[in-house]
Amino acid sequence: MSNPADSDIARRGFLKTLASAAATLPLPPPNAAAAIAGASAATVATTSATVSAQTAGNPADGYQYFSIEEAALVEAVVDTMCPADQLTPSGTACGLATYIDRQLSGSFGNGGRTYMAGPWQTGKPQQGYQLSLDPKSFFSAGAVAAQASCQTTTGKKFQELSPTDRDAFLHSLSDGKITSERVPLAQWFNDLLYPLFEQACFADPIYGGNRDKVFWRMVGYPGLPAFNTLNVKEFRGKPFPDAKQPKSIQDFS
């Protein structure tokens, strides 16, 4: 019988394996990207209207943007990629879903720093974000498509799967093995959801994730860069003495 702790550690391989998978993933097929990228204005309008109807004015308890279904999906995702074990609490307990929700409800989610005037064409990886939906709408469209694909392939919603099956489904998303005619799901996962997960782990706790600085403590990061600038040279490659008590923005407010 395998050790549950060993299984949890193995599932943390997401932090290593998905980074390389995202870098080498081919572009989604044109018919998948076109539905979102704007080749069909009617499709984009329908997708956007559907997404807006599902989320507007009806956030799940404790969230600013997520609908109830989105909250259930994201909480299951972050708990799969960050399981509760001897290293950290679960992803939800660490505030990872809260961080993602806040990013989508704010300037980032609304495309505040993204050129959104078109024209909409399938771009190359080096050209960055090329879709006609703002990030929050792309997230919601992807969440619907991912959940539908999960139910089609497994007969269950993602949050109803076992931890092992959730892990396998997420890897299939990342590898481009799970597809949708309406949404480029590999791009959705690798370029939007997973980067937000990484940010949630290591951002300052003031933004909702990394609760109690748990990830900073885990890797020995001392906290606010400006506070430790003078120590970088002295402690380069060595454990920092105060890393067990890292400092965040709130500690100086």
Predicted regions located by residue number:
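Mature-region segments of soluble proteins
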Residues: 2-5, 58-59, 69-76, 87-253
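N-terminal secretory signal peptides and thylakoid transit peptides that target proteins
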Residues: 3-25, 29, 33
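Short, charge-rich amphipathic segments
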Residues: 15, 48, 74-76, 80
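Functionally constrained cores in energy, signaling, and assembly domains
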Residues: 20, 26-28, 82, 103, ...
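Signal peptide processing junction and immediate N-terminal pro/mature segment
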Residues: 30-50
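Short, contiguous pre-domain boundary segments
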Residues: 52-60
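Start-of-domain signal
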Residues: 63-65
